[in-house]
Amino acid sequence: MGGSARARWVAVGLGVVGLLCAVLGVVMILVMPSLIKQQVLKNVRIDPSSLSFAMWKEIPVPFYLSVYFFEVVNPSEILKGEKPVVRERGPYVYREFRHKANITFNDNDTVSFVEHRSLHFQPDRSHGSESDYIILPNILVLGGAVMMESKSAGLKLMMTLGLATLGQRAFMNRTVGEILWGYEDPFVNFINKYLPDMFPIKGKFGLFVEMNNSDSGLFTVFTGVQNFSKIHLVDRWNGLSKVNYWHSEQCNMINGTSGQMWAPFMTPQSSLEFFSPEACRSMKLTYHDSGVFEGIPTYRFTAPKTLFANGSVYPPNEGFCPCLESGIQNVSTCRFGAPLFLSHPHFYNADPVLSEAVLGLNPDPREHSLFLDIHPVTGIPMNCSVKLQISLYIKAVKGIGQTGKIEPVVLPLLWFEQSGAMGGEPLNTFYTQLVLMPQVLQYVQYVLLGLGGLLLLVPVIYQLRSQEKCFLFWSGSKKGSQDKEAIQAYSESLMSPAAKGTVLQEAKL
């Protein structure tokens, strides 16, 4: 009896443990998604107490700026009206450092800041040095000529004489460092003196002179602390709720984030929208496919073909016009009127007429498309590669002799890639806290549910076996009683009178 009672209590105990495991597993299945969501919301908002605040304040990911130049091979022939021939040079790679300063939390659930950036040349990653000479179109001459096309003959003559006096030509041979970070040009002083409204440029002239040791303006974005639906969205840039560069309300809108973090809990129907001060506009990327980066699930977002499409191909872009062929965006309105165009490298995703007009271009989606890999649960970028090209529209301008017989063409100057991938300690921390732990908890809840189900079977099986033993014992007892009754009945039948007579008769025989 002692052993049987002990076994019964063990079975009951295991059943109770199983019930608790099953209940805990069910509770975790029901509650865990909500808890994870709350933790994510708590740690992706812009708040000093959140896990992502330090990452937001000073990006720990190493960013690189890689620049590729389109060196002009036949400048003399271009002046005679022949097709341009270019040769790609580079990359010239710079390490980019960013950190936010003047961080001010406002009463309306927003935070204001400026982001300082500095660039440092990386010889070991580059194909060449900053002292390399490259032949490019002289933007001040050829760009200025297009800007002067509608001016009076007198102004054009003055410009021609000024260029000749200063020794300015249609194409220049300058170093990488000068082209990017600026050089002293007497023509800039000439323009500022005689045509002050043409180029509001002071000091050095360079394509990226405003990108180094500078900032991209004062951003005010929503923190998501009080209103999660607006997390990371830009409220104002330099105090503006919209820009005034373009010709439609929609194109002037400041939409999306500042381009560093997005709202969490993305789906394939989500899009990445951000405002780019360099492009003077908001841009939208669309979902391409799902993937994995260093064990972390990601969504890849890429640029749709409509990003730089002209108004005839994509009517909402009409506000960015006047336009030329589809696939390039005229940014002259935010670049002092200079005939500069923005596009994908090598005119990828643009009208083939553009790449066919210049020899040496080979658009390739694997080399020239841009992408951002985002962790969909948190909205934090894991890996990115943003590639853009700057081109100059050049042509012969009557009255300005330096332009010769140049045929109208959009001539690429350079393309650049801004890339970065999370790695090292930030990646390990991110993976452990936001990927590994939720996965472990997910496995635990199902293990508890399965274990609970198995343990609940123990008392059930014990009860069934106990009933079976009782049935066998009862069946054996009943059979024994029936045998005894049969023997007794047989004995009594032998002692009855009828039975005795029969026995005597048989004896006589």
Swiss-Prot record:
Membrane topology term:
Multi-pass membrane protein
Q: Which Pfam families match?
A: CD36
- Give the CC-aspect GO terms: caveola; cell surface; lysosome
Q: Which residues lie on this side of the membrane: Extracellular?
A: 33-440
Cytoplasmic compartment: which residues?
Answer: 1-11, 462-509
Q: List the disulfide bonds.
A: 251-384
Question: Which residue positions carry a glycan here?
Answer: 102, 108, 173, 212, 227, 255, 310, 330, 383
Q: Give the taxonomic lineage as stored in the record.
A: Eukaryota, Metazoa, Chordata, Craniata, Vertebrata
Instruction: Report which superkingdom the organism of origin falls in.
Output: Eukaryota
Major location category of this protein = membrane
Modification note: N-glycosylated.
Q: What are the transmembrane regions?
A: 12-32, 441-461
What name does UniProt use for this protein? Scavenger receptor class B member 1
Q: Which GO terms describe its biological process?
A: adhesion of symbiont to host; blood vessel endothelial cell migration; cholesterol catabolic process; cholesterol efflux; cholesterol homeostasis; cholesterol import; detection of lipopolysaccharide; endothelial cell proliferation
What is the documented function of this protein?
Answer: Receptor for different ligands such as phospholipids, cholesterol ester, lipoproteins, phosphatidylserine and apoptotic cells. Receptor for HDL, mediating selective uptake of cholesteryl ether and HDL-dependent cholesterol efflux. Also facilitates the flux of free and esterified cholesterol between the cell surface and apoB-containing lipoproteins and modified lipoproteins, although less efficiently than HDL. May be involved in the phagocytosis of apoptotic cells, via its phosphatidylserine binding activity.
Q: What are the UniProt keywords, alphabetically? A: Cell membrane, Disulfide bond, Glycoprotein, Membrane, Receptor, Transmembrane, Transmembrane helix
User: A Gene Ontology molecular-function term?
Assistant: lipopolysaccharide immune receptor activity
Family, similarity comment? Belongs to the CD36 family.
The compartments listed are: Cell membrane; Membrane, Caveola
- What PANTHER family would the database entry show? SCAVENGER RECEPTOR CLASS B MEMBER 1 (PTHR11923:SF110), SCAVENGER RECEPTOR CLASS B TYPE-1 SR-B1 (PTHR11923)
